[in-house]
Amino acid sequence: MKLRTVAASLLLMLSATTVRASAADVGAPVPIYTEAELIKLIEQNKHLQRVRADNCQLVEDIVARATRINLPAYEFLYGDMLAWGVCVEQDVELGLYYMENAAQQGLPAALEQIGRYYSRGTLVQQDKERAIPYLREAASMGNLNARIHLAELLLRDYGSPLDYEDAYRWLYNSVTADQRQHKRIAVLRRGLEQRMPQNIVARAKRRDMFW
């Protein structure tokens, strides 16, 4: 009887140890990102890195929020995952579809990225004119990268001179602690100033309350 009791105790101890080891191997459950947290990751271009760092544990949650609830930040994340084959089977066309959905819902990061893709010919055929509306919309919503990229394209004679005033005003009212971006903005502003009448430059500086 004693031998049976000892054997049973040993089996229980071994089972508990195995469970603890398995839990340690898997790691603690990863909480789903809040929309605010995800948007910040996207703005820092760290969203795919974060998904990889979380060992792809949140794929089902991400897919559900993108395809069933249609949350724009999650549509963008899922689209980017598909486009680059991160934690899911690569499907560039479907990835761009979800990124476009996020852009249509007004997510600035999605608008900026699609505009950048068209401008540089990433995943899609290069079309700088097609990039302009995406970048312009993102710039109007405060996306700094879009503001810089839009001004660069305008100074290379893409888009319309009618956009100079808005592009200048957005740069003039942009705030950044990044010294390289700060200098780049100053260079782009000077370039636009050379193409604009002084009264339009003055008006762009005054209308800082209109976005």
From Swiss-Prot:
This is Sodium-type polar flagellar protein MotX. It is a peripheral membrane protein. The power to drive the polar flagellar rotary motor of V.parahaemolyticus is derived from the transmembrane potential of sodium ions. Force is generated by the motor on coupling of the movement of ions across the membrane to rotation of the flagellum. MotX interacts with MotY, which is the presumed stationary component of the motor. MotX may form a sodium channel. SUPFAM superfamilies: HCP-like. Signal peptide: none annotated. GO terms for cellular component: plasma membrane. GO terms for biological process: bacterial-type flagellum organization. Keywords: Bacterial flagellum biogenesis, Cell inner membrane, Cell membrane, Ion channel, Ion transport, Membrane, Repeat, Sodium, Sodium channel, Sodium transport, Transport. One of its GO terms (molecular function) is sodium channel activity. SMART domains: SEL1 (SM00671). The keyword Mitochondrion does not apply. It comes from the Bacteria. PANTHER family: ERAD-ASSOCIATED E3 UBIQUITIN-PROTEIN LIGASE COMPONENT HRD3 (PTHR11102:SF160), SEL-1-LIKE PROTEIN (PTHR11102). InterPro entries: Sel1-like, Sel1_AlgK, TPR-like_helical_dom_sf. Its main location: membrane. It is found in: Cell inner membrane. The lineage of its organism: Bacteria, Pseudomonadati, Pseudomonadota, Gammaproteobacteria, Vibrionales.
